[in-house]
A protein has these predicted regions:
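Hydrophobic anchor at the beta1->P-loop junction of P-loop NTPases
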Residues: 5
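Conserved substrate/cofactor phosphate-moiety recognition/catalytic segment
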Residues: 18-63
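Walker A (P-loop) ATP-phosphate-binding motif of ABC ATPase nucleotide-binding domains
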Residues: 2
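Conserved lysine of the Walker
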Residues: 13
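Short loop/turn segments at strand-loop or loop-helix junctions that form parts
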Residues: 32-33, 76-79, 118-124
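The conserved Walker
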Residues: 9
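A glycine- and Lys/Arg-enriched "phosphate-lid" helix/loop adjacent to the NTP-binding pocket
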Residues: 90-153, 164-167
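Glycine-rich phosphate-binding loop used to anchor ATP phosphates in small-molecule kinases
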Residues: 52-112
Length: 182
């Protein structure tokens, strides 16, 4: 199964993928991470992002999904994440309408490479961590979460792809997904 894990920052996507790989060693996850990409290219992200950074991220995520075409792959982020953050930048006037439309089309196109989307929503129980790559602004994180919900609802209506929402402890998330992939 080809799975993409999506959600706002500070929800535990990377931790979930690591936990999943421990339980399911037959799965792989692409080696080049989003965090490494941001550092390597000095990209502006979160509230500071713009078209240039989002274009680099979009291409890297597309390449990762296209190149990792095996049967058992789990992705830590995908073009849905890229679209959501681009859309939030669009709402702040940092991304053009043309760019956001192209991002949305590319996001929809990439769904053909996936069989399942795992959404980890924001939880009030999760401690917000601020670092170079995570924004601690609760209002921004809530906006990102709302945009994820909106686009996932649209995807669920338009595409035959399984969308799973996971919450709870690390162990509960793995247990819940295990029931759905076996």
């Amino acid at each position: 199964m080809r799975i993409a894990v999506v959600g706002a920052q500070n929800v535990g996507k990377t931790t979930f993928v690591a936990d999943f790989l421990l339980k399911y060693p037959e799965y792989i996850s692409p080696k080049v991470s989003y965090k490494e990409l941001v550092e390597k290219h000095g990209l502006k992200i979160n509230q500071e992002t713009g078209e240039e950074s989002q274009a680099v991220i979009m291409q890297a995520l597309w390449d990762s999904i296209e190149k990792n075409s095996g049967e058992n792959v789990i992705f830590d982020r995908c073009l849905i994440d890229n679209y959501v953050y681009s859309y939030c930048a669009y709402l702040k006037g940092k991304v053009s309408p043309e760019f956001i439309e192209a991002s949305k089309e590319k996001m929809f196109e990439h769904l053909k490479f996936l069989e399942m989307i795992v959404f980890i929503p924001v939880s009030v129980a999760v401690e917000i961590q601020s670092d170079k790559q995570r924004d601690a602004d609760r209002n921004f994180i809530d906006l990102v979460n709302r945009v994820f919900v909106e686009i996932l609802l649209e995807i669920s209506k338009r595409f035959p792809i399984k969308i799973v929402v996971l919450s709870g402890s690390r162990e509960e998330r793995i247990k819940d997904l295990s029931r759905m992939i076996v």
